[in-house]
């Protein structure tokens, strides 16, 4: 729970820097998409805020299982904003010549190697093993491959990585797997999986491992916006960021247990 709260607090700090000067509620319908998982956690309360009248904007929020479902809609202008993996945002910025840009960082390091057993204690113990993972072609794949190489393992020869389209599929595979199954999962899926299986343990915090070999901060998810849309609607952007911050704060309130006085 501490890890989840830290993740949400990080998002509040990053969004609050940008959320100044928001205007009163407008009739603008903001079309926004998100991936199921940590990149979209901060957005989940927008619809309830809209329903109870506390949102500054009207939202059309759609959730998708894979990034390739979002990309064409964003490029075609069928979406205004999206919460996506950081590496994908960089690729889209290049491909669109700056037509899609980062508006906020929404997720820092939330990736973990977990095991249903007690055989893995370091990267060296992963040699010859099969690793279940989500995020092929996105941040989880690149982070895992990078760290394997930095720890002396060839990701194409020394391990076998099996990719699934959604983290929920990985957790299902782990639940059904025999002992010693290994996976890379993001929060909050790690916590959810451990609640269902007490034998599942975290063996490597990939943020800590990243910090050991790299001087830059590990950013896994961002919220992007079409540049043209942002230029034409600065008040909408400011209002959205304010709502975004409120949504995250409400999640922190829910996830943080009540403490006795």
Language-model segments: residues:
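Generic alpha-helical secondary-structure signal
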Residues: 7, 73, 128-129, 173, ...
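Residue-level detector of short, conserved catalytic/binding motifs and their immediate flanks
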Residues: 11, 111, 221
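Short, low-complexity disordered leader/linker segments with a strong preference
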Residues: 1-29
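A residue-level signal for beta-strand positions that form part of recognition/binding surfaces
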Residues: 29, 222, 257
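Pocket-lining segment of extracytoplasmic ligand-binding domains
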Residues: 87-88, 169-251
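Single conserved hydrophobic/aromatic residue that forms the stacking wall/gate
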Residues: 252-261
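Short, glycine-/small- and polar/acidic-enriched structural segments
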Residues: 25-164, 179-187, 203-204
């Amino acid at each position: 729970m501490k890890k989840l709260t830290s993740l949400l607090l990080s998002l509040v700090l990053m969004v609050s820097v940008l959320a100044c000067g928001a205007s009163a509620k407008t009739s603008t319908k903001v079309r926004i998409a998100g991936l199921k998982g940590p990149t979209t956690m901060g957005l989940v309360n927008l619809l309830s805020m809209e329903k109870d009248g506390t949102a500054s904007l009207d939202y059309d929020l759609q959730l998708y299982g894979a990034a390739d479902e979002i990309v064409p809609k964003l490029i075609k202008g069928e979406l205004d904003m999206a919460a996506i993996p950081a590496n994908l945002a960089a690729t889209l910025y290049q491909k669109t010549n700056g037509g899609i840009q980062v508006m906020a960082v929404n997720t820092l390091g939330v990736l973990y190697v977990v095991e249903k057993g007690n055989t893995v204690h370091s990267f060296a113990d992963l040699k010859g093993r099969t690793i279940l993972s989500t995020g092929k072609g996105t941040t989880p794949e690149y982070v895992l491959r990078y760290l394997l190489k930095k720890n002396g393992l060839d990701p194409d020869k020394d391990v076998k990585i099996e990719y699934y389209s959604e983290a929920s599929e990985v957790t299902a595979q782990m639940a059904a797997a025999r002992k010693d199954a290994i996976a890379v999962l993001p929060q909050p899926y790690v916590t959810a999986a451990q609640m269902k299986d007490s034998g599942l343990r975290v063996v490597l915090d990939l943020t800590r491992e990243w910090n050991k070999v790299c001087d830059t901060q590990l950013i896994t998810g961002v919220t992007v916006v079409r540049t043209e849309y942002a230029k034409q609607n600065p008040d909408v952007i400011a209002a959205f960021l304010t709502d975004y911050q409120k949504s995250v704060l409400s999640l922190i309130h829910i996830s943080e247990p009540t403490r006795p006085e």
